[in-house]
Amino acid sequence: MIIKPDDRWRWYFDDEQQKLMLDLANGMIFRSRFPSKMLSATAHQSSPFTVDDAALYYGYDEQIRQIDMPSESRAELALNALIAHRFLKPLMPKSWYFEVSHSSTRPYLAQVVETALKDSNEKVLFLVAEVGEQACLCLLAQPQLALFDRTLTFCDPLKIMNDRLSEYHKQSEPRSFLYEKVI
């Protein structure tokens, strides 16, 4: 599925589903994965899909292309990153799951980054949805991540301290996204 932002797209909140929706104006509707309690007050008001939204979407999509994933998943991750950037309430960092990175990189918006789990040193992929001075709001860019106290699924948000993030290198990708979906 290839989607192209359009000036007829619009954001609205669906009271029945308690989710932010994006009307794609072609009979398709994208439903955000974030529950109502995570969304800011502006998410509950209808608004147009702006030129800035389109620019962010294309920025996320371009960076996500580094990861071996189907176009549907790429669009889902890009749209959820855009929603996280625009409409998510602030989150507190939860960096205790990850090792401090030895490479000093300054994360940038829409960057695909990796981090290593403290207990296993397993590499984990995230997409930077929002950059902060000390920490970034990131979305999980792989099918699943088992942590010691919970399991994250694709597109789940986590705020991570910048010193835990490192530049993603394709050859170090832990597994193919396509095979994870099949198994």
From Swiss-Prot:
Q: Which UniProt keywords apply?
A: Cell cycle, Cell division, Cytoplasm, Septation
Q: Which GO terms describe its biological process?
A: division septum assembly; FtsZ-dependent cytokinesis
Q: Which domain of life is it from?
A: Bacteria
Q: Which GO terms describe its cellular component?
A: cytoplasm
The record's section on Pfam families has: ZapC_C, ZapC_N
Which InterPro entries did the record assign?
ZapC, ZapC_C, ZapC_N
Q: Where in the cell is it found?
A: Cytoplasm
Tell me the function of this protein.
Contributes to the efficiency of the cell division process by stabilizing the polymeric form of the cell division protein FtsZ. Acts by promoting interactions between FtsZ protofilaments and suppressing the GTPase activity of FtsZ.
Subunit architecture: Interacts directly with FtsZ.
What family does this belong to? Answer: Belongs to the ZapC family.
- Name of the protein in its database record: Cell division protein ZapC
